[in-house]
């Protein structure tokens, strides 16, 4: 009997700092599963990479007085060496600065836009008068309007895991200088996520491989009503938004890093002289995609990533399993690279 191919993925860690043990947990779990399926005789590919874009990197680079590229080039090399010391059996550990990744992501989103799932909208967003910049994602902090956590960021609350609108933060402040932001109007490109509500509900409900925490969180998210998600940011660090009129905008990190599971597969087979074979892992219906993540990444892997794949109309395999670990606490607090809490893997 022919055994189906298995693609094992682990969440791409931000590398503004060395990783802590909490970051390593899903990677270790993925490594165990990759080794298991290899022993069972399956063709297995295990991919991941360093997420070098996004505001976590930008904020840390500002604090250190270096460029995001300088910071991430150094940390990527360090992380690769650490994974070798931990004997993680990656087939391809790459980076979101990979030319293959950039090309794939831009072509992918052009397709999504051509299919009618992208629109523009003017929004009021926080702007720091001292730093003279808009404050996307981790450039702005405040109190979570849902759970009251004081250190919530502009895109997500670390404490309760909710995706946030930065305009809803209570007592918002610039994470660089601490100033209270002004709110200025700017145009962004949005993904029409609500159009996938029914398909996502059916997919999540019927997928018996999902652990209860991932299924329950995701179904609650859908029940509360999916909202269009902004795809672009006012930033020059990241992948340029490939939409007409979007000059000077980059893609929000969660609209490009999850696509790295596909681009890393493409990159692996390109470098091994078989450039079309990646399709066997992403389109053959006897192949399975397994994602290993931390619980704060659930909505990006069970909602946004599947919706993006559906939006291409190309028949991508959706994740067969999204395995999630709970947060690893250290001295009573959630491990966090940005807050320098945890046990470091070096």
Label the model's feature ranges.
Residues 1-41, 45-48, 95, 100-103, ...:
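Structured secondary-structure scaffolds
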Residues 2-121, 129-133, 145, 209:
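N-terminal Rossmann-like or analogous alpha/beta NTP/dinucleotide-binding catalytic cores
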Residues 34, 58, 80, 109-110, ...:
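Short glycine-/small-residue-rich flexible loop motifs, especially phosphate/cofactor-binding loops
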Residues 84, 114-117, 162, 179, ...:
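Generic secondary-structure signature for well-ordered alpha-helical cores
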Residues 111, 146, 159, 199, ...:
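Alpha-helical scaffold segments in soluble metabolic enzymes
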Residues 116-190:
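Cys/His-rich short segments
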